[in-house]
Swiss-Prot record:
The gene is mlaA. It is a lipid-anchor. GO terms for cellular component: cell outer membrane. Residues 1-17 form the signal peptide. One of its GO terms (biological process) is intermembrane phospholipid transfer. Involved in a phospholipid transport pathway that maintains lipid asymmetry in the outer membrane by retrograde trafficking of phospholipids from the outer membrane to the inner membrane. Required for intercellular spreading of S.flexneri. A lipid is attached at residue 18 (N-palmitoyl cysteine). InterPro entries: MlaA. This is Intermembrane phospholipid transport system lipoprotein MlaA. PROSITE patterns: PROKAR_LIPOPROTEIN. It comes from the Bacteria. A lipid is attached at residue 18 (S-diacylglycerol cysteine). The keyword Signal applies.
Length: 251
């Protein structure tokens, strides 16, 4: 169920971003917009169509779905201890122990995490959107800082992307060498791009794709930091979306 909520949230943030494109309205900082638009054009008009998207299409079409699921489960399992720590830091020991249990069961019984044994055994142990250190900072109201579009990386803020580097201090992530970390990041990026292939039309139809991507980034991280909730006072469409999420959760 949580995965369904996360998937819907990811999709709806793309739509919500169009209706709330004002940086001042959202309280976002984008002082480098000129530079960011240049980097966006490189990332999404050069790098994506000629390199990233073809790789993602090949990944989706030629890698069997069970193999994709297994690799996604494995890379996600590496983050479970860090997610556990972040829930403890947020004052939520119950969710912290949920992620400890997921890591223990999937590592021992799930071939090192390739099989999500915990999620199959108990719906309360299903995989969720990971809470990283950036989410913990957001939980306590720390601001994003300036928004930046980085070449090859995409959207970046000091709070969420810079803060997430703290997660690498915890095992198992701290055990990874630099090439291993790059490999993990690459696999996750390709899988994420493959999942979003069917959403390419949203960007093509947008009058300002840069604004759409920027606001989708903020909306997604707000959603995670707020524990899976959208605040109506921050967006005029949030209440309607929140009602849809509740309807799905009640199924």
């Amino acid at each position: 169920m949580k995965l369904r909520l996360s998937a819907l949230a990811l999709g709806t943030t793309l739509l919500v971003g169009c209706a709330s494109s004002g940086t001042d309205q959202q309280g976002r900082s984008d002082p480098l917009e000129g530079f960011n638009r240049t980097m966006y054009n490189f990332n999404f008009n050069v790098l994506d169509p000629y390199i990233v998207r073809p790789v993602a299409v090949a990944w989706r079409d030629y890698v069997p779905q069970p193999a994709r699921n297994g690799l996604s489960n494995f890379t996600g399992n590496l983050e479970e201890p860090a997610v556990m720590v972040n829930y403890f830091l947020q004052g939520d020991p119950y969710q912290g122990m949920v992620h400890f249990t997921r890591f223990f069961l999937n590592t021992i019984l799930g071939m090192g995490g390739f099989i999500d044994v915990a999620g199959m055994a108990n719906p309360k142990l299903q995989r969720t959107e990971p809470h990283r250190f950036g989410s913990t900072l957001g939980h306590y109201g720390v601001g994003y800082g300036p928004y930046v579009q980085l070449p090859f990386y995409g959207s970046f803020t000091l709070r969420d992307d810079g803060g997430d580097m703290a997660d690498a201090l915890y095992p198992v992530l701290s055990w990874l060498t630099w090439p291993m970390s790059v490999g993990k990041w690459t696999l996750e990026g390709i899988e994420t791009r493959a999942q979003l292939l069917d959403s390419d039309g949203l960007l093509r139809q947008s009058s300002d794709p840069y604004i759409m991507v920027r606001e989708a980034y903020f909306q997604r991280h707000d959603f995670i930091a707020n524990g899976g909730e959208l605040k109506p006072q921050e967006n005029p469409n949030a209440q309607a979306i929140q009602d849809d999420l509740k309807d799905i959760d009640s199924e």
